[in-house]
Amino acid sequence: MRSSAKQEELVRAFKALLKEEKFSSQGEIVVALQDQGFENINQSKVSRMLTKFGAVRTRNAKMEMVYCLPAELGVPTTSSPLKNLVLDIDYNDAVVVIHTSPGAAQLIARLLDSLGKAEGILGTIAGDDTIFTTPASGFSVRDLYEAILELFEQEL
């Protein structure tokens, strides 16, 4: 197998292991990769890969400190449309919630506020990566949700 293909296979295996969120030490990751047939892997290589892919230690569902990869976020470019900053749109009985790339919520909220009541938006509250939007009088939350989906060309 070519070394670049072997490297790609190693990266895939490494990322798959971290997605399991059960490895609390670099040594455990080394052993798991060796068990998958990557004999030449060592702690130093795992450490470099953790840094390269931005892995962090965090608590999993069992409250154990484990290594995991951050959510893969598309970094916006000067030519990318705003819709690429919107990651998810959902709603309940009261508000529409929009999740964005980190740092983009206030920009998207300002756009929504500029559309105003005529488009069904009473107002928005934005944090770093989350927006709460409430419908204007005469609009249902579902109507607002569908209008925002259409605006950002998201799938239902």
From Swiss-Prot:
One of its GO terms (molecular function) is DNA-binding transcription factor activity. One of its GO terms (cellular component) is cytoplasm. Pathway: Amino-acid biosynthesis; L-arginine biosynthesis [regulation]. GO terms for biological process: L-arginine biosynthetic process; protein complex oligomerization; regulation of arginine biosynthetic process. The keyword Repressor applies. It comes from the Bacteria. Belongs to the ArgR family. HAMAP family: Arg_repressor (MF_00173). Regulates arginine biosynthesis genes. This is Arginine repressor. It comes from Salmonella arizonae (strain ATCC BAA-731 / CDC346-86 / RSK2980). The gene is argR.
